[in-house]
Regions:
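Serine-hydrolase catalytic machinery in alpha/beta-hydrolase-like enzymes
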Residues: 8-107, 198, 202-203
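Short beta-strand immediately N-terminal to the catalytic nucleophile in serine-hydrolase-like folds
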Residues: 110-113, 138
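A conserved short beta-strand
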Residues: 130-142
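Short beta-strand/loop motif that positions the catalytic acidic residue
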Residues: 152, 158-160
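Conserved alpha/beta-hydrolase "acid-adjacent" motif
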Residues: 165-170
Length: 216
């Protein structure tokens, strides 16, 4: 399968964020990755999942929610990593940019969020009800989305490791507040980062099935 891959800089508010847009031939949808704190678009886990998506004709955009300068500051002060409204606003800005780009303007969009990035994805989905076709949360903290959970209309898949007991409970509580179609899948034997053999492959499989169902 032929992929068209482009390094892009997207203006969002007063800054520009950097990303990698990959569009396989025949792609009808694009999945935007919202990474968690301390991660980036170069994360080996997200890179692996993105490649699996591409093999299934799903486009992907891996981008950094923070600028390089903000990342440097965050390492020292942690002032940005839990600023979920800021992260959500960046995701919204990037989504709107894709909607206006000739290559992607007619495609369906999905969000793949990890850890705190999942909360940002859910807030963005709540604020863009007509734009986001589906959301997948990997080891996410949907509880950080707070009051916005009830406003999410996009079908949402919550993936949590079976050994990540605290996060399982938080996801169960968040599900109770959601009125959209939602599903919680607990992956046995997996911890928070799904580092155990074969567990990230399961994440990719469940996610691909979900996105292919809704990104049309």
């Amino acid at each position: 399968m032929i992929h068209q891959q482009t390094e892009i800089r997207i203006p969002v508010g007063s800054v520009k964020v950097e990303g990698t847009l990959t569009l396989p031939s025949g792609a009808k949808g694009v999945v935007l990755f919202a990474h968690g704190s301390g991660s980036s678009r170069f994360s080996t886990r997200n890179q692996y999942v993105a490649k699996e998506f591409n093999k299934s004709a799903l486009g992907t955009l891996l981008f950094d929610l923070l600028t390089a300068e903000e990342e440097e500051t965050d390492v020292l002060t942690a002032e940005f990593r839990f600023n979920i409204p800021l992260l959500a606003s960046r995701l919204i800005g990037v989504t709107e940019w894709l909607r206006n780009d000739p290559k992607t303007k007619n495609m369906a969009f999905g969000y793949f969020g990890a850890s705190t990035g999942a909360a940002a994805a859910l807030i963005a989905a709540a604020k863009l009800p007509g734009e986001v076709a589906a959301v997948v949360s990997r080891g996410g903290r949907p509880d950080f989305a707070g009051k916005y959970l009830a406003s999410v209309v996009a079908p949402t898949l919550l993936l949590v490791g079976g050994l990540d007991t605290e996060v399982i409970e938080l996801n169960e509580q968040a599900m109770e507040q959601m009125t959209s179609e939602k599903k919680l899948v607990i992956i046995p034997g997996a911890t928070h980062l799904f580092e155990e053999p074969g567990k990230l492959e399961e994440v990719a499989k469940f996610s691909i099935d979900w996105f292919l169902r809704y990104l049309r």
